Structure formats: C-alpha cells, structure tokens
C-alpha cells in the first residue's frame, strides 16, 4: 500500500481541520443550554446525545490526515471518560483551544519543544491550585447537586444521591433499562461478582437468560470439579432438602458438569455452577468473603477440608441468587452479622495500609460487596431514542458523582478554571516557554466562553467580567445571573476538571511537536468490475 506523507505546516494544518470538525460537533453540547447531536445508526433509530465521548467516537472523516487530527482529540475525550467518567466535552474544548493557539505560535516561528515545556509547567500549577480550592463533598444534598448538574436533571440528582445513601459511597450502582416511562431506584441488598454460569443449560428463566435460585445452598470451594463422585455425597444431601444448589468452584467440567446439566434438564434438581471470582490470593480472599456473607465454609485442601466428606452444615445459605451470563448476585446471605462486621473492619485496615493503587481499588470493591449492596437505577423513557439518551446522561452523572466523592468539588460552569487563572499567569517563564503558559491561559477561558455562547451570549464579555469577580463567583448560564457557584449548587468534581485539563494538554503538546504525518494513499477506483457481461434484456 503506497503512503502519502505531509510535513510541518501542511501536516499540522490538515490535522487541525480534523480537530476543528470534531470539536465543533462536540462543543455545542456544553453547558445548561447546550444542544444535542444526532448520530446515525446503521440499525435501529438514531442516537440523540449530549455526551462528548459518544459523539467523538462516532466521527470518521474521509481525508486521512483530517481523520488523524480528529482521532487525537477523540483520544482526549476517551481518556478523560476512562479516568473521570465525565467532562469529555470540556476536555475536547480545552484541547481544541490549546492546539489552535499553539499552532498560531509554531507557524510564527516558535519552538514547539519550548511551548510544550510551558504548557506542562502551566498545567502542573493549575492542577495544584485546583486541588487547593477543592472542597470535600458533604451529605446527600451535595451529591444530588453534582449529579443534577451532570445529567441536567434534578430528579436524576435525587435518585443518585438516594442510591449512594442506601448502598454507601463504596456500594455498587448499576443502570438497567426500565419497561415503563419512569426512572426509579431499586436496591438489591447483596454481593455481586463478575462470573456467570458455566453452562447456558443451567438457566431457569429463558427470556432473561438468567438462573434464579430461591433459598439455595451454596457450595464454596477453590478446587476444580470434574469428577461427579467428588460432589455426589453433598448433592444427595441437598436433593433431600429439596433446595437448589449454587456451586462456586475454580471450574466445573467434564462428567461433573454433564451430570448437573442432565439432572437440571430432567427436572431432578437445580444446580448452577459458576467459576470463583478473582485470581490467586485475591480469589482465596473473595471466596472467604462469600463464605462469611453466606454463613458457609470454603472447602479447601489447604484448610484440611475435603469435598467428599463435606456435609450440609458447611454450605452457605442465601434467600436468593441470580446468575446471568456475566454476573452472580447473592442476595441476603445468611452469615453471622458479627463475623461480617469483623471482616469489613479487617478489609478497612488493609485499605489503610496498602500503597498500591490497584490493590486499593480491589479492596474497595470487596468492601462494597460486603458492606453495601447493589443499587439498580431503572431508566425509563417514552421512546427508545430518549431512553438511550437518558441512560448516557445518567451514566455520566453517576461517574461524576463518584469522582466528586473521591477528590471533592470545585465551582462549576468553567469558573474553577478561571479561578486558577492568576496563579498560572504568575508563572515565571521566558521565550517559547512563556508562550506555552499563555496558550494554557487562553485555553482555560474557553469552557466559560463556550457555555456563554451556547446560551446565546457574548462569551468574551462574560470571560472578562469573570476575571475581576471574587473566586467562586460565576455566571449561571441557565438563569443569566452572577452567583456564588457552590452555594447555587453549580459544581464540578475536581477530578473531572483536573483530568480534562491534563489530558487536553497532553494531546496538544503531542500535536504541536508533530513534524510529519504518514497516511495511506487512497486507491484509485477503476470503475466497474472487469469482464462483466452486458445485462441487457434482463428484467
């Protein structure tokens, strides 16, 4: 495949056209008066959304050089979404502003490496200052405000705040599509882990493709079960009780799996097998968690327990277990509350000691599963198109709220970025480095300017006034008033604002230091297929 190469100014200009096309499509959604974007779907109804990352991912441009520029900015939105779960439109607006300003200076002869240093310096100062002005989130009301701003819907804010109150900040909150018009909250007390049934023949509800076990016994082991003789004694005891059985094991295969499936199909008894969650030592810990929650024991040779000699007393109990293709939820485990409390305290102690980010995340998950439960927000709407749009909004709001709980909140509506303006402006830098700082200064005005423009106002007027206002005072584009943003409940999670700025700067710096771009040369279309006979006379 032949390649086409463009250099320096020509390359950057072509990529900038792509950046502008993508960013212009995304930034119309910013702020309380932002509009929606309609995305064509090959199948089904079009998707209407105001979610930056969803729009960015859909955009493919014909010109390969423009497309590369667009893809770079889509990466900003995508990375911000991965880290903070929201703020993707802000990140796109910041990236476009930095790239545009930077390109002007590079064209005028500035050194891209010097500019890059300046950008990095300015962003580091801005991030430190954002952390300094960040306020911790307190109470249900603050949580509701963050969620309501993100979803542009107060009702959603209340729902998410209630969900977090019910299952705790550590709890698991999932989204489902409701059959009706209303959006409601359903709290499932219980533990969920990401392992589904070993065989689809084990399902009890063919419509939902899930296995629902009422009052089951739960066998928990770290062994691989392939020989039916290993579990025959315990199966016989469970069958006598007339209750279903959930088997959590390293794996269930071969003869053992075949026997369980055949008996399920014949209606002799119901047993569902799932693989144990996690790996290595983490798996042992999670199995122990499940055992404590359900009042059972982990059948492990390390602990001197053998499958063949297991009695019904070693099995856990729960009022209900739901197993889907991907997840298992244990509801209302019959474990001793004192033992569960002790286990929770043990995990909390480990959380305080750990230095690894990954371990912390996994311990948080385990804590959530033991301490809280699972809250399900059932999203309802009149049409499928509205349902998809609403679901995306609520997903963003949920991520936003979690980010706020983690790192606190700052004034919303782009005000927080303007509040760090003076600190960034005070950076001592010379030459091209100073130019890099100025680029960031110009970029951090952009979200406020865009929010005002989307509300039909002159952005520059709002930006200039904001520079003279006290910190925390900002422009409420929804009402057209100047207010104390945090008091008015217009807040953004610090993590979202920080991630948007850092990711935008990272991609802008890469963009400005680009000197050559290589793309596939489009193939010449030679017209119709050769050798096709004349179709004359065919009806």
Curated annotation (Swiss-Prot):
GO biological process: protein refolding
Residues reported in the UniProt entry to bind ATP: 29-32, 86-90, 413, 476-478, 492
Keyword Nucleotide-binding: yes
EC main group: isomerase
EC number: 5.6.1.7
Record keywords: ATP-binding, Chaperone, Cytoplasm, Isomerase, Nucleotide-binding
Subunit structure, interactors included: Forms a cylinder of 14 subunits composed of two heptameric rings stacked back-to-back. Interacts with the co-chaperonin GroES.
Protein name: Chaperonin GroEL
Organism per entry: Geobacillus sp. (strain WCH70)
Annotated gene: groEL
């Amino acid at each position: 495949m032949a390649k086409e190469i463009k250099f320096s100014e020509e390359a950057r200009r072509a990529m900038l056209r792509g950046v502008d096309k993508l960013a212009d499509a995304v930034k119309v959604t910013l702020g309380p008066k932002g509009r929606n974007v309609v995305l064509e779907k090959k199948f089904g109804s079009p998707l209407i959304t105001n979610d930056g990352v969803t729009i960015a991912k859909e955009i493919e441009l014909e010109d390969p050089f423009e497309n590369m520029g667009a893809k770079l900015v889509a990466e900003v939105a995508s990375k911000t979404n991965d880290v903070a779960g929201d703020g993707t439109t802000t990140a796109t607006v910041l990236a476009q502003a930095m790239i545009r300003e930077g390109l002007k200076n590079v064209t005028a002869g500035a050194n891209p490496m010097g500019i890059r240093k300046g950008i990095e310096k300015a962003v580091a100062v801005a991030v430190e200052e954002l952390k300094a002005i960040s306020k911790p989130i307190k109470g249900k009301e603050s949580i509701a405000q963050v969620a309501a701003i993100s979803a542009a819907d107060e009702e959603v804010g209340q729902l998410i705040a209630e969900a977090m109150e019910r299952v705790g900040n550590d709890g698991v909150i999932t989204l489902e599509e409701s059959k009706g018009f209303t959006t409601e909250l359903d709290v499932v007390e219980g533990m969920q882990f990401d392992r589904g049934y070993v065989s689809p023949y084990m399902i009890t509800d063919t419509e939902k493709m899930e296995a629902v076990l009422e009052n089951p016994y739960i066998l928990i082991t770290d062994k691989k079960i392939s020989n039916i003789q290993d579990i025959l004694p315990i199966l016989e005891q469970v069958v006598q009780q007339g209750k279903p059985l959930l088997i959590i094991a390293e794996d269930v295969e071969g003869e053992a799996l075949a026997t369980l499936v055949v008996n399920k199909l014949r209606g002799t008894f119901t047993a569902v097998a799932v693989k144990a969650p996690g790996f290595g030592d983490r798996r042992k810990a999670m199995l122990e968690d499940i055992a404590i929650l359900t009042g059972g024991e982990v059948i492990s040779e390390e602990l001197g327990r053998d499958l063949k000699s297991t009695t019904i007393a070693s099995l856990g109990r729960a009022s209900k277990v739901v197993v889907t293709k991907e997840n298992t939820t244990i509801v209302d485990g019959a474990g001793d509350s004192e033992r569960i409390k002790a286990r929770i305290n043990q995990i909390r102690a480990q959380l305080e000691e750990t230095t690894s980010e990954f371990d912390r995340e996994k311990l948080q998950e385990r804590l959530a599963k033991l301490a809280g439960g699972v809250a399900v927000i059932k999203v309802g709407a009149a049409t499928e198109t509205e349902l998809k749009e609403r679901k995306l909004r609520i997903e963003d709001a949920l991520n936003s709220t979690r980010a706020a709980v983690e790192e606190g909140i700052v004034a919303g509506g782009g005000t927080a970025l303007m509040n760090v303006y003076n600190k960034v402006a005070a950076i001592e830098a010379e030459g091209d480095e100073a130019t890099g700082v100025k680029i960031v200064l110009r970029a951090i005005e952009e979200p406020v300017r865009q929010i005002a423009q989307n509300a039909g106002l002159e952005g520059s007027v709002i930006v200039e006034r904001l520079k003279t206002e006290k910190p925390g005072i900002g422009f409420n584009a929804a009402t057209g008033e100047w207010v104390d943003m945090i008091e008015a409940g217009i807040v953004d999670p610090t993590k979202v604002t920080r991630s948007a700025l850092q990711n935008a700067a990272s991609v802008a710096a890469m963009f400005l230091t680009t000197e050559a771009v290589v793309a596939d040369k489009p193939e010449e279309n030679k017209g119709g297929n050769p050798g096709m006979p004349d179709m004359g006379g065919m009806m």
